[in-house]
Amino acid sequence: HFGLVPKEHWSYPSWIDQIKAAETRKKMEEAAIVYGESESYRHMCRFQSGFFFEHPLTYELGLEYYWRVEPGVHLMCDVDFDPFVFMQLNNKAYGFTISTHEYSETIPTLWSETLKFAQKHPEYIAPDNAMKFVTDSDSLHGSDYNLCHFWSNFEIGDLRFFRGRQYKQYFDHLDKAGGFFYERWGDAPVHSIAASLLLNRSQIYHFDEIGYEHSPWAHCPANRQKYHDNGKCSCNPDDSFDFDDWSCNKLWWSLSVEGAPE
């Protein structure tokens, strides 16, 4: 099935000052910030942050879960189970393979806007949340963003989480703040912060068993006996991004209910 993105999901909302947005793009281009000059990239990030789960096809097909697959990626392990059934049976709402750090220059006010929202809606913060994945502080008050996020070019998730009141109000707050255009907010930190605060830790899952490559990084399961000696995976664990200093997977494993992969 193929569909078109509704025009209103890929255009400027009425409250955005397009001259100010253009000035931001020019400054970011001069500063050599990745995608800093791109107008289309910003529309893409806003769409993936706030509208993909509202696409008419997702309703027409009666979808409850989704798997984001981008052009040019490689799956390097046999997927011999149904990830959607796994998510449903284990009450998972968000799954990922790779995590990394965001470029701070692209999101100067994303965290402060998040704190404003959390202060306004403390009841939305999950009781057993994964806050420590996105901040090194012990409480949200006075905290800073540690820049960790799930790399959203691979996501398996529950559409009902994104369609829920908590997430939609969070996105609406961010959208009105204008940072998708006045800065260069990505959908990865938006999804990651939302999942870490609005979901319980047990609802987030690292798909270690799925080898995945999206240039320039890859995730490859480390257990050779379980995944490689039997030919299940074709990747090299030595090339996995998991143990790179720029990866946040080790932090996630320390917080997750499953712990580090065996």
Predicted features and spans:
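Conserved acidic residues
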Residues: 63-64, 72
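Short linear interaction motif-like sites in intrinsically disordered regions of transcription factors
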Residues: 11, 16, 112, 247, ...
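C-terminal helix/juxtamembrane-tail motif
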Residues: 234-262
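Catalytic core and acceptor-binding pocket of nucleotide-sugar-dependent glycosyltransferases
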Residues: 59, 73-234
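Active-site-proximal specificity loops/subdomain of glycosyltransferases
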Residues: 1-63
